[in-house]
């Protein structure tokens, strides 16, 4: 069952297009990591899924049952959020607002769900504390608990580990993985490629002129996937997109219909990923098929 279907999507602001030609599907229970250079439209894509940003081209379809039951959303952490003057319990319960409808008070089921969410995130002892008094890691746990209360099907996370210390990062990844193992589909924007390939079932790589979608295994079979998997920490901080994507061995892949687990867009014309990978295996090195390469 597809929860999200995206076909040839274009996203833009008044200043111009930030992403184009983006295509992917998210199946129930999947774990999708969205990676890519800064400014490539990753956060904007999440906002479009929940209806906070319009689509400028292509189609973006969210399963009606998911929209009805709610989508959990953990946005990027901002200074305004860190200073929010509310208790942990109040913030977590606010995740139940959509399911509560017009009910003017918290139902017993809402309170129970919020209590369960706080317990599983290890913050039940902080229920009465003010949110702005907590550490960054504790605040992220609160927001993850809130997102969990909003849905049992789909959670969108925008750089949930940004600014966390290594121990807090490990705990956050573990809790997200636990939710996914219980059947909750996860879409996470991250610059931590090493973690993305460790936890995700699928990778969406977004760039100003490039887009890849496929299984983690297919991503790691591409030269660019291998390059980033080797990078310590998987950070994009000093990545040069021209060096990575304009290298002769990357080819120009447009539509991989022969490999259902991978669809890629690189430039205006394309060749099969299977042909590129086959050439790589035969030659024991980088694929040299440059058919369709921009001139």
Positions of predicted regions on the chain:
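Conserved ABC ATPase "signature" region
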Residues: 108-126
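Conserved ABC ATPase signature
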Residues: 130-134, 138
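Catalytic Walker B motif of ABC-type/P-loop ATPase nucleotide-binding domains
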Residues: 155-158
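H-loop/switch region of ABC-family ATPase nucleotide-binding domains
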Residues: 190-191
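H-loop (His-switch) and adjacent beta-strand-loop-beta switch element
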Residues: 203-215
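ABC ATPase nucleotide-binding domains
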Residues: 217, 221-295
